[in-house]
Amino acid sequence: MSVQILGKGKKVALKRRHARLRKHISGTPELPRLVVTRSNRHMVAQIIDDTKGVTLVSESTLTSDFAGFEGTKTEAAKKVGELIAKKAQDAGITAVVFDRGGNKYHGRVAAVAEGAREGGLAL
């Protein structure tokens, strides 16, 4: 199954990279997928079971856990990783497949992964 995404620009390149990644990465009930979505202001992390098409756990900088949070965007991303690891362990999830969503494994995306590892989640 090949996905053809045509065009130029950052958003198109991001979608092309993500489509390439998704050919190899998929979440199962035993090993769900940790998806990281990055915007200019916020970070969203979701743990997804692709066989059922269900989001098992999610965490974001938009949730009430971040009310009054003061720090850099990278520190917030690390906290998102720690919080999703805690929620995953409460749901009985110990290991996941990391899906960087076409973004480089650098900066805030890497901070989410680092926070999840420190929270006890195996990537």
From Swiss-Prot:
Keywords: Ribonucleoprotein, Ribosomal protein, RNA-binding, rRNA-binding
Keyword Transport: no
GO biological process: translation
Cross-referenced InterPro entries: Ribosomal_uL18_bac-type (IPR004389), Ribosomal_uL18_bac/euk (IPR005484)
Gene Ontology CC terms, in alphabetical order: cytosolic large ribosomal subunit
SUPFAM superfamilies cross-referenced by the UniProt entry: Translational machinery components (SSF53137)
GO molecular function: 5S rRNA binding; structural constituent of ribosome
Function: This is one of the proteins that bind and probably mediate the attachment of the 5S RNA into the large ribosomal subunit, where it forms part of the central protuberance.
Family to which the UniProt record says this protein belongs: Belongs to the universal ribosomal protein uL18 family.
Subunit structure: Part of the 50S ribosomal subunit; part of the 5S rRNA/L5/L18/L25 subcomplex. Contacts the 5S and 23S rRNAs.
NCBIfam families documented for this protein: L18_bact
Name of the featured protein: Large ribosomal subunit protein uL18
Gene: rplR
